[in-house]
Amino acid sequence: MDTTTAAPQPDHGPLRVVVGCDDAGLDYKEALKRDLAADPRVAEVWDVGVGTGEHVAYPHVAVEAARRVAEGRADRALLVCGTGLGVAISANKVPGIRAVTAHDSYSVRRSVLSNNAQVLCFGQRVIGLELARTLVDEWLGQRFDERSASAEKVAAIGGYERS
């Protein structure tokens, strides 16, 4: 598999996670950031915004988080906006990034296991906080297997970025 399109994720060990949101996702981002910081599967958590009272358009926050992952400064990103859609679309503009909006356990698991998605996006207006917490917990437990049948498909996705 071609690994030049994104920084490889470690097979084991704690993850470096970047979090971000717009003002519509601030409450969930703050709660999930605290959960991540307390989780032994997470080595570091970086917050790229927004903070209380800030009004930064979601594309700027999502792209900053995605760039950190693509450059290898973080392993994964968790983004929250009103629907989870805008931040996913924005993050996917960064070469090598596979961002998904997922609001159910199966999709969260498959996003990593089948698609090697490094960025998980939620909509604060779409799901409850306890479900978001459960999904983040499940997400942290998943690792992509570079030897899986999905690896060839993920490599094909990366190939389209260069064509």
Q: Model features per residue range: what roles?
A:
Residues D2-A6, P10-G13, V18-D27, S105-S163:
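C-terminal binding/interaction regions
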Residues R16-V17, A74-A77, G96-R98:
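Short active-site oxyanion
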Residues D27-A38:
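Short, solvent-exposed amphipathic alpha-helices that sit
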Residues D27-Y28, V56, G86, E130:
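Residues that form or flank phosphate/diphosphate-binding pockets in enzymes
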Residues V42, R73-D75, N116:
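Short, high-confidence coil segments that cap the C-terminus of an alpha-helix
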Residues A43-H55:
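A short beta-strand-loop structural module common to alpha/beta enzyme folds
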Residues H60-L79, T83:
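Short, structured active-site "lid" loops
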Residues L79-R125:
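Mid-chain, well-packed structural core segment of small domains
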